[in-house]
Amino acid sequence: IPAHGHTNPTLAVVRELTARGHTVRYYTTEAFRAKVEAAGAVFVPFDTEAARPGMTAADGARLGSDLTFSTKLIVDRTLAADDWLSRDLTVHPPDVIVGDSMAFWAKLAAKKHGIPFVSSTTTFAFNRFSAKVIGQNGAGFLQFLLAQPRINRQLKRLRAAGYAVKSVFDIIANDNETETVVYT
């Protein structure tokens, strides 16, 4: 995620990995090139339209409250990056993909290509109790149910491109088997 609060916590991990002789390829925007290269990573430009929000303020407000809109945005961004990212992962096959918990494309690419995935969580760790803490209620559940046909249309687009997703939770939630790094 091209944001200081998502990038800065990861730089110490990058420094440690590269100091131990690992190659780290860091996908981000040009604005973060100097930081990731100074930490020892290989900068991989992710300045394509897939990485740019391209949203209005009203769209930004919808992200937290409109699951259908959010799912479409995630699918659009993932599919926009699919060809070049798949080529890059073939040319430079990683042992593992460490992706920001909000960079859903990273998790989806790892799953599609059979690469182990580690979630880098720069906020708090999400688990099965998180929805209760953040205020899921009956109205929210009804909204979720009513949105399912539109969400499923978006998921079909991902499946057509080779992404094995069954539900929106395959995109936005990690299971108990997903390794997670949480920065405190």
Stretches found by the model and what they are:
Residues 2-5, 15, 94:
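Alpha-helical hinge/cap motifs
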Residues 22, 27-184:
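Nucleotide-sugar-dependent glycosyltransferase catalytic domains
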